[in-house]
């Protein structure tokens, strides 16, 4: 396959055209008065969204050279979404502004490498950096950052959910209930209302092995108060292995929950018969997870309940298990799909040790899937799980609302983690002085000036989307000395943004600028593009006139 190669200014202009096509589609969604983008889907109804990364991911350009530019900016949005969970549109606007100004200066004779050095130094001055020991050195943005308290959590959620107060309040309530380590999941509701459900204690998605274990026929649940808990890695099929333990438990009169890979045959039949006779209040469930993850989850349950996970590694056989090896909890509730353990009797020091261990695994893992599963395990040990059930009148609205709730949830987590700064693009404008303080000269100075201009761009775009003149608003805010003074595009007023609840998570703003500066710098220092030459499809020749039967007209 032959390739086309484009050099110098032509390569940068091709990238710029691609960047502009993508960024112009994404940036209309920015701010409280941002517009919707409708995306055609091959199956089902069109998707209506105001989420920058969703729009960016849908864009593929016909021209292969321009498409390279679009894909690189798409990377800015995706990376920002992965790290901070929000700020994708801001990152796209910044990347476009930096690259557009940079291309002009390279065309005018500036050295691209010196420009990139200036851009990198300016971004570091604003965002800060980590030194060789991994300690965080704060940047100008950190000076305006404040920790999140009380009402602010709801305000961050509201802004990220495109000014939907209901979503903001529900997310704040969920964070309050499960804490910052708790897991918040988003599901589709069967009703039109958006509701919050909180599962206290540890829950896993395995139900009872037989409906005969049910103690509350009305709710079809098995509720066992103050039970012993046997945690076993393998299948339990022979009754003789279990008998010594069951006899000891039956004497004490307390219920028993068995968590094992499976309980089948003779063992299951005997347990059911004893339950029905009233000899022993018992319930059996399958162990959660698969493979190594199952082993880890059983260990979590053991630590939470103060028991031992009977695994092959320990070398303990089921017939040799003592009462001391069993865990216990205040209550275990089992329905056909889920098991919930409330107030396990494990030692708090053991639980804290396990939590630390899982936290370090979360930091080390490179897989998003593994990280999500580890965080779920962490939440089950520490706080519990909150489920936000999103309701809407139509499926199209449901999808759009669910995406907004997920965005708002990520933004709120980021705010709790690193604090908040004044929103509406104002925090970035306040960092211009830090770039001036670098006193860079020559082409590096031009690179720093590119960042100074780009820092104003999100505010210009927010104001432009609200139907006002961006340059006037930027000038007025720049001249005002109060760092919290800014423009509330929702009400078209100049206010103290923090008091008005117009705030952004520091992490989101910082990540957006870092990623935009990184990719724009790479694109500026590009001197050649190589891509496949698109094949021209030959049109099929028209078919001849079909012959007819004799006597036909």
Swiss-Prot record:
Gene3D superfamilies tied to this protein: GroEL (3.50.7.10), GroEL-like equatorial domain (1.10.560.10), TCP-1-like chaperonin intermediate domain (3.30.260.10)
Binding-site positions, ATP: 29-32, 50, 86-90, 424, 504
Keywords recorded for this protein, A-Z: ATP-binding, Chaperone, Cytoplasm, Isomerase, Nucleotide-binding
Predominant localisation class: cytoplasm
Keyword hit for ATP-binding: yes
GO molecular function: ATP binding; ATP-dependent protein folding chaperone; isomerase activity; unfolded protein binding
Keyword Coiled coil: no
GO terms (BP aspect): protein refolding
Enzyme class of the recorded protein, top EC level: isomerase
GO cellular component, one term: cytoplasm
Protein EC: 5.6.1.7
Pfam families noted in UniProt: Cpn60_TCP1
Catalytic activity: ATP + H2O + a folded polypeptide = ADP + phosphate + an unfolded polypeptide
Location within or outside the cell: Cytoplasm
PROSITE patterns named in the record: CHAPERONINS_CPN60
PANTHER family linked to this entry: 60 KDA HEAT SHOCK PROTEIN, MITOCHONDRIAL (PTHR45633)
Family, per entry: Belongs to the chaperonin (HSP60) family.
Assembly mode: Forms a cylinder of 14 subunits composed of two heptameric rings stacked back-to-back. Interacts with the co-chaperonin GroES.
HAMAP family hit by this protein: CH60
Function: Together with its co-chaperonin GroES, plays an essential role in assisting protein folding. The GroEL-GroES system forms a nano-cage that allows encapsulation of the non-native substrate proteins and provides a physical environment optimized to promote and accelerate protein folding.
Name of the protein: Chaperonin GroEL
The organism of origin for this protein: Koribacter versatilis (strain Ellin345)
